[in-house]
Amino acid sequence: MRPEDFEHVLAAAAEATGQDEFVVVGSQAILGSFAQPPEALLQSLEADMYPLRDPASADAIDAALGDGSQFHLAYGYYAHGVGPETAKAPNGWQKRLVRREIPRRVASTRSPVAWCLEVHDLVLSKCVAGRERDWEYAAETLRAGLVGADVLLARVPDLPVAEDLRAHVERMLRTIIASL
């Protein structure tokens, strides 16, 4: 998803929900910290988000902008309405969210704001998900110098998951770091 597509889907979410502030927790949250991240980090066609002040209205995002919606069919990308529990990011992630104002669209009265996971929290939440593409994402952020290995490793103990999963995340990160 290109940065302009991210802005478009956020603006559309504002129109669909009547909300202006959204928390972005998926891979597109990288666009909160970096205007032009490496192309390899922008492969997803989905923006995972929920309205900050009314997370329950995330269903309206799925209905209007979700996978298979008219919006998706028209533009080739879509939004996935999620909830605050979706992000398995290190404790305190809510205090580290990165604010990105989205330009107002023509004929819109909404001024959307994306509150994006801070990049280290984003990478660690993807590591918890643990799919191959998530590990590739983590490796690419390290390779591109977008995250610090020391910060990632320091936040692993703060992940809200079982100890065995935290240990696995740390082992995998150390393996990736050693390979760079």
Predicted regions located by residue number:
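Compositionally biased terminal segments of proteins
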Residues: M1-L180
